[in-house]
């Protein structure tokens, strides 16, 4: 994974973002709400629901500007090490309910080839 941003936060947790995640999250969520999500994940990295058949990718809700958590953004991330969380993809609920099987296959391959 060559295109990513590294951000260190509390509890020595390192957040590593894919370039598409960085683009999507900045379009969807204000900095304050994203920071709250990072703090929450640093303290509870297993908070997101495991996506079946994903190779360990988790999905968690994140409040989006003016939408709250329910109607907000969905954040996909991978956590396998005690000090790193890979922020993989983000989308708004009004764009789609879930990722497609094709997208899931691609993200699973990304995890298997680059993050494990």
Can you annotate each of these PLM segments?
Residues 1-32:
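Arg/Lys-rich, positively charged N-terminal/basic patches that mediate binding to nucleic acids
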Residues 14, 58, 97:
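Residues that recognize and position ribonucleotide moieties
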Residues 25, 37-38:
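Short Gly/aromatic-enriched secondary-structure transition segments
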Residues 31-34, 104:
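Amphipathic alpha-helical transducer elements in NTP-driven molecular machines
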Residues 39-69:
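A short, surface-exposed loop/turn module that caps and links secondary-structure elements
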Residues 64-66, 77-80:
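Short, low-complexity Ser/Thr-rich regulatory SLiMs
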Residues 70-75:
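Short, surface-exposed coil-to-beta transition loops
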Residues 78-116:
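Enriched for short, Lys/Arg-rich terminal
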């Amino acid at each position: 994974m060559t295109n990513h941003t590294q951000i260190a936060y509390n509890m020595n947790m390192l957040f590593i973002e894919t370039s598409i995640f960085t683009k999507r999250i900045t379009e969807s969520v204000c900095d304050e709400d994203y920071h709250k999500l990072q703090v929450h994940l640093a303290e509870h990295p297993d908070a997101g629901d495991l996506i079946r058949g994903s190779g360990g990718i988790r999905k968690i809700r994140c409040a989006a500007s003016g939408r709250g958590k329910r109607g907000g953004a969905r954040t996909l991330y991978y956590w396998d090490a005690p000090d790193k969380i890979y922020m993989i993809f983000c989308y708004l609920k009004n764009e789609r309910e879930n990722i497609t099987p094709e997208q899931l296959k691609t993200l699973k391959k990304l995890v298997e080839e680059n993050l494990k």
